[in-house]
Regions:
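Rossmann-like NAD(P)-binding element
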Residues: 55-100
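NAD(P)+-binding Rossmann beta1-loop-alpha1 motif at the extreme N-terminus of oxidoreductases
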Residues: 1-54, 59-62, 66-69
Length: 100
């Protein structure tokens, strides 16, 4: 079982959780700073309004302020699934955490 960190709780990041969970991996979805409300909702209901479907209750949903802690946990795979509004944010954050 691999630890997979998916950054972005939108359509792309959330859809990627399905094959990961189906293959027995431990999945954490970390929202961008723009997705705090979505993370709160997913954590409570496990229903993704945009995808119009339930997501696995095995997924750990976290807000963006938990990024550093998640990177220190050394995930086996990091998937960046943010849209164009979030790419600058995550690029800077990953650069600061992984390469400095």
């Amino acid at each position: 079982m691999s630890k997979i960190l998916i950054i972005g709780a939108g359509v792309m990041g959330s859809a990627f959780t399905f094959p990961c969970i189906d293959n027995g991996h431990k999945v954490t979805v970390l929202g961008s700073p723009l997705e705090n409300d979505r993370i709160d909702e997913l954590s409570k209901t496990f229903f993704h309004k945009i995808l119009n479907c339930n997501v696995s209750k095995e997924i750990n949903f976290l807000k963006s302020d938990q990024l550093r802690q998640q990177l220190k946990a050394k995930p086996d795979l990091i998937v960046v699934g943010v849209n164009s509004k979030g790419i600058n944010w995550i690029s800077k954050e990953l650069n600061n955490e992984l390469f400095l």
